[in-house]
């Protein structure tokens, strides 16, 4: 190419510039010295043109390289902008959700009042307005939480003139073997610049009735003859011997009336609106069945849940410590009080759809007592789930799915997937993968105050499916997200002895945990 470039310049010089250097033939003479000078000038010009050609070649190559780099930088900038826009969108949705939860909590707390009145003033105050939970210190220095709510009958047309006031109670936290009152009143102390914490695991929660319970709700396991026989006997005993008002499910009321017309005193509900007001009526909830019956009973209450007394009449029960054969003695002791209870935390979950038409359009909030499961369903592809904890990236799940479990659900699906068994009163969220395609993917236990977001990325090969305590199955498309956090309303279940004793006994009896023949003492 350079030779062609020289040739072109030579032709141009011969056709134009050379003529200007030679003498005009019309003058009649030719000077040899002038011709030699002309040839020398041509050689000098050729020498000057050669480095110019090389410089032009380098400039062309450099400009092409700059265009290539600019194109690559432009593509990277566009990709980064898209990623930042997507992250900003999820952050905005999360902040809107969090602010909404904070507003709801402030509204709930604003309805509460401190319990500083005397007993006479307290009853007068209860007649005027309901009070939620207020913390106080009892006369013996024990930390308590009182719950007083006035029963309002306006929501039930069929329940008028049935009941005027709901029973009140208080909860007490007691430390074993701790004589120092400081550990009874404070979780964290910082006296004299020294930080100390009380041992929360040693605290057993007790429920003491301040007024007699008046209303009991009984939830039964369906399609069981033994449960039906026991429910008939229990309803009759609670009514005739204890004078309590009885609520049952519509199905159970029909069964009781078919048994005898004398059960016409039993009350029930007709629609979801009446169910939503049950917590203002019911003082105690009794379940006859297994853990599934407890889950069903808890799912009926989208807010506060009355204390539950679970009787074991199922195949396996980690939350049902009471035996049905001694139900009268058990209920006598519970109605009299005080009783030890286990506070079982729940998760509140909702789905945010990518195709939502408004800025913030979540679906109905679901409450789970055991776990929420995200799996691949019938798809032959692995699930691809991006997981975040308070907007911090956790990991990308590639496997059969993921389990977000409460500590009460640690002995259920999470245990089968390799998760640890955790005491139900330990507040936390279990993060357990289902058959992950990674040897290093081990389960996690996250603190109770975090918010976990699981979303299906846009490049996922398939959708995912989510279920809440094994029901209400929903599909998650690409771009959809599931947001889970700890619910403000726990489920309190009565203990036969105390919380830790019941938990250890349940894993020994239900799972035969660490059951092995004892090694003989006369070994080799």
From Swiss-Prot:
Listed EC numbers: 2.7.1.23, 2.7.1.86
Protein name: NAD(H) kinase 1
UniProt keyword annotations, A-Z: ATP-binding, Kinase, NAD, NADP, Nucleotide-binding, Transferase
GO terms classed as biological process: NAD metabolic process; NADP biosynthetic process
SUPFAM superfamilies, A to Z: NAD kinase/diacylglycerol kinase-like
UniProt record similarity statement: Belongs to the NAD kinase family.
Gene (UniProt): NADK1
Reaction equations catalysed: NAD(+) + ATP = ADP + NADP(+) + H(+); NADH + ATP = ADP + NADPH + H(+)
pH influence on activity: Optimum pH is 7.9 at 25 degrees Celsius.
Organism lineage: Eukaryota, Viridiplantae, Streptophyta, Embryophyta, Tracheophyta
Function recorded in the entry: Phosphorylates both NAD(+) and NADH, with a twofold preference for NADH. Source of the cellular reductant NADPH which is an important antioxidant factor.
UniProt biased composition (Polar residues): 1-13
Region annotation Disordered: where it falls in the sequence: 1-25
Superkingdom assignment: Eukaryota
Induction notes from the record: By gamma radiation, hydrogen peroxide and infection by P.syringae.
InterPro entries: ATP-NAD_kinase_N (IPR017438), ATP-NAD_kinase_PpnK-typ_C (IPR017437), NAD/diacylglycerol_kinase_sf (IPR016064), NADK (IPR002504)
Tissue specificity: Ubiquitous.
């Amino acid at each position: 190419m350079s030779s062609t470039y020289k040739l072109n310049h030579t032709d141009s010089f011969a056709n134009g510039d050379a003529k200007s250097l030679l003498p005009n033939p019309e003058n009649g003479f030719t000077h040899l010295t002038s011709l030699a000078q002309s040839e020398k000038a041509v050689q000098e010009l050729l020498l000057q043109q050669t480095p110019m050609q090389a410089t032009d070649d380098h400039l062309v190559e450099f400009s092409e390289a700059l265009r290539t780099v600019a194109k690559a930088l432009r593509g990277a900038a566009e990709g980064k902008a898209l990623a930042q826009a997507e992250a900003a969108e999820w952050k905005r949705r999360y902040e809107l959700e969090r602010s909404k939860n904070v507003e709801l909590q402030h509204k709930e707390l604003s309805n509460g009042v401190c319990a500083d009145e005397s007993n006479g003033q307290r009853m007068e105050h209860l007649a005027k307005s309901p009070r939620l939970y207020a913390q106080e210190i009892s006369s013996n220095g024990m930390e308590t939480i009182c719950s007083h709510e006035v029963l309002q009958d306006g929501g039930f047309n069929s329940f008028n003139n049935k009941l005027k006031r709901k029973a009140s109670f208080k909860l007490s936290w007691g430390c074993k073997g701790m004589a120092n009152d400081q550990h009874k009143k404070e979780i964290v102390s910082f006296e004299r610049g020294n930080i100390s914490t009380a041992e929360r695991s040693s605290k057993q929660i007790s429920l003491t009735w301040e007024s007699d319970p008046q209303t009991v709700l009984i939830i039964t396991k369906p399609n069981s003859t033994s449960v039906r026989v026991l429910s008939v006997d229990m309803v009759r005993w609670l009514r005739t011997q204890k004078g309590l008002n009885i609520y049952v499910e519509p199905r159970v009321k029909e069964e009781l009336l078919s048994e005898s017309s004398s059960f016409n005193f039993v009350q029930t509900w007709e629609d979801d609106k009446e169910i939503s007001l049950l917590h203002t009526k019911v003082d105690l909830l009794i379940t006859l069945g297994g853990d599934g019956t407890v889950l069903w009973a808890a799912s009926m209450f989208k807010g506060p849940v009355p204390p539950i007394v679970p009787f074991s009449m199922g195949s396996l029960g980690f939350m049902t410590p009471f035996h049905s054969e001694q139900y009268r003695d058990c209920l006598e002791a519970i109605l009299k009080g005080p009783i030890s209870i286990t506070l079982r935390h729940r998760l509140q979950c909702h789905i945010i759809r990518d195709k939502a038409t408004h800025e913030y359009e979540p679906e109905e909030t679901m409450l789970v007592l055991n776990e929420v499961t995200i799996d691949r369903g019938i798809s032959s592809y692995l699930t691809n789930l991006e997981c975040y904890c308070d907007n911090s990236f956790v990991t990308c799940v590639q496997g059969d799915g993921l389990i977000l479990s409460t500590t009460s659900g640690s002995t259920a699906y999470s245990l089968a997937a390799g998760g640890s068994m955790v005491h139900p009163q330990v507040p936390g969220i279990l993060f357990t993968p289902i058959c992950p395609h990674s040897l290093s993917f081990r389960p996690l236990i996250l603190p109770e105050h975090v918010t976990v977001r699981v979303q299906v990325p846009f490049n996922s090969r398939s959708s995912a499916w989510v279920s809440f305590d094994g029901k209400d199955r929903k599909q998650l498309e690409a771009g959809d997200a599931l947001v889970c956090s700890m619910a403000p309303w726990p489920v309190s279940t009565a203990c036969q002895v105390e919380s830790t004793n019941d938990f250890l006994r349940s894993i020994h009896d239900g799972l035969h945990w660490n059951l092995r023949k004892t090694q003989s003492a006369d070994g080799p």
